[in-house]
């Protein structure tokens, strides 16, 4: 038995251990090591035929439980559909109604509607007020159970449970980690273009549960998560020079990151969470510095008569990619995390900016400006394999999902409107708009919460 302990509720705490406990018994996981039949998604760089999957409403013991169960099934359905790897079957086509998940389904009924995988689940309220969630994942062709788990949580976290289950399904059927149990911090924009109010905001990756972290008194840009997901670093234009701040999501407290002369901007955490790398303006130049958050000591990494900005660490923390105009136009460079010689990796026509390293380490995403368009693309760290994923009037600010398979960015269509968030996978397929309350820009995807 696997036990995940801790049920204390923390209002802004994102870590799973303070919200949800789960356990998986041998009975629940029976068959999970069996060979897969047809229910398997092969992820390649080319087109992928989405896997037909049936996701009935989770059953419950009361009308209230049934309502929550329907909501959980809907969130799972939307998550898997938006990934582009799954084709959820309309519930109107179902022949069999699932009423008891402890009884194996009649797989012939699900084969008839061409389902290759089936998800069944149950939501029940416990005597202590907690919500118990259970699910089973079935291979319809073989009749084998592929996965199963049960969780206990406070009722208000039912959406979080749905995201965790979505990740379990995604991983079992693709062989790769999911990305649904994650958050996005972004800049919420409201008001006219002449009097735009910008606030830091936090939401689930699907656009739900939006929370505002700042009030909009000062302009904010480029928020970035810490590896623990408990802190955000960002740039704020207050009185005086723009500064880099550190915001604690749990407590709501913020602090300035170093009291440097001149501007500080483009902050990002190191993978260990103990350092922040940023650009500092000195005279007419901007160079890269790294600050140790414990000792407050600062180390200079670049020293050129140019503008070096937008740094991003490799997942292992050994290298940094950044933007520099030291060769004329802004281009992408890679160097060791302690400084030294930098290698230019972008050589296409146009200017390159906002580089960010994939959590997988295989690609660096960027914004490219040229030919009257702004494009989002990816390139390998050695400079090979450059690929443009999407182009338009103004696309900018890519950020990777925790599994490195999906990018989020913002697009401003012009014409007096405002920007919106979009996702696209690294093959350039499945471009989708992300729902937000208003205009939105500068997204940053968190690591997985669980």
Curated annotation (Swiss-Prot):
Its main location: periplasm. It is found in: Periplasm. The keyword Cell cycle applies. Keywords: Cell cycle, Cell division, Periplasm, Signal. Gene3D superfamilies: TolB, C-terminal domain (2.120.10.30), TolB, N-terminal domain (3.40.50.10070). Residues 1-37 form the signal peptide. One of its GO terms (cellular component) is periplasmic space. InterPro entries: 6-blade_b-propeller_TolB-like (IPR011042), PD40 (IPR011659), Tol-Pal_TolB (IPR014167), TolB_N (IPR007195). Pfam families: PD40 (PF07676), TolB_N (PF04052). GO terms for biological process: cell division; protein import. PANTHER family: PROTEIN TOLB (PTHR36842:SF1), PROTEIN TOLB HOMOLOG (PTHR36842). The Tol-Pal system is composed of five core proteins: the inner membrane proteins TolA, TolQ and TolR, the periplasmic protein TolB and the outer membrane protein Pal. They form a network linking the inner and outer membranes and the peptidoglycan layer. Part of the Tol-Pal system, which plays a role in outer membrane invagination during cell division and is important for maintaining outer membrane integrity. Belongs to the TolB family. This is Tol-Pal system protein TolB. It comes from Nitrobacter winogradskyi (strain ATCC 25391 / DSM 10237 / CIP 104748 / NCIMB 11846 / Nb-255). The gene is tolB.
């Amino acid at each position: 038995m696997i036990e995940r302990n801790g049920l204390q509720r923390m209002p802004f705490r994102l870590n799973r251990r303070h919200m949800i406990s789960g356990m998986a018994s041998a009975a629940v996981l029976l068959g999970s090591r069996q060979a897969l039949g047809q229910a398997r998604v092969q992820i390649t760089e080319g087109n992928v035929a989405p896997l037909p999957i049936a996701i009935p409403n989770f059953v419950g013991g009361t009308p209230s439980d049934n309502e929550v169960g329907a909501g959980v099934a809907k969130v799972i359905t939307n998550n898997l559909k938006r990934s582009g790897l799954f084709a959820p079957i309309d519930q109107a086509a179902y022949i069999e109604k699932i009423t008891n998940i402890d009884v194996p389904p009649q797989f012939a009924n699900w084969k008839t509607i061409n389902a290759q995988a089936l998800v069944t689940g149950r939501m029940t309220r416990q005597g202590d007020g907690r919500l118990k969630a259970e699910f089973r994942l079935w291979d319809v062709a073989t009749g084998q159970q592929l996965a199963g788990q049960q969780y206990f949580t406070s009722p208000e976290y039912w959406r979080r449970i749905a995201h965790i289950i979505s990740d379990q399904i995604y991983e079992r059927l693709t062989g790769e980690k999911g990305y649904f149990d994650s958050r996005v911090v972004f800049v919420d924009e409201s008001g006219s273009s002449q009097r735009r109010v910008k606030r830091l905001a936090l939401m689930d990756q699907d656009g739900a549960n939006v929370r505002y972290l700042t009030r909009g008194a000062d302009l904010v840009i480029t928020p970035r998560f810490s590896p623990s997901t408990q802190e955000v670093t960002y740039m704020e234009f207050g009185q005086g020079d723009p500064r880099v701040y550190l915001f604690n999501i749990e407590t709501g407290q913020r602090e300035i990151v170093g009291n440097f002369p001149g501007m500080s901007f483009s902050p990002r955490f190191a993978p260990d969470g103990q350092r922040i790398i940023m650009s500092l303006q000195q005279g007419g130049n901007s160079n890269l510095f790294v600050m140790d958050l414990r000792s407050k000591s600062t180390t200079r990494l670049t020293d050129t008569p140019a503008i070096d900005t937008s740094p991003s660490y490799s997942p292992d923390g050994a290298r940094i990619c950044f933007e520099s105009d030291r060769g004329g136009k802004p281009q992408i460079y890679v160097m060791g995390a302690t400084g030294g010689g930098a290698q230019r990796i972008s050589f296409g026509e146009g200017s390159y900016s906002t580089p960010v390293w994939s959590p997988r380490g295989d690609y660096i995403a960027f914004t490219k400006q040229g030919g009257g368009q702004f494009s989002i693309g990816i390139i390998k760290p050695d400079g090979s394999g450059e690929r443009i994923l999407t182009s338009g009037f103004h696309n900018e600010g890519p950020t990777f999902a925790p599994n490195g398979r999906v990018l989020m960015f913002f697009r401003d269509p012009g014409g007096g409107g405002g920007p919106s968030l979009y996702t696209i996978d690294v093959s350039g397929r499945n471009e989708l708009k992300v729902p937000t309350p208003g205009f939105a820009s500068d997204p940053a995807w968190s690591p997985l919460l669980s």
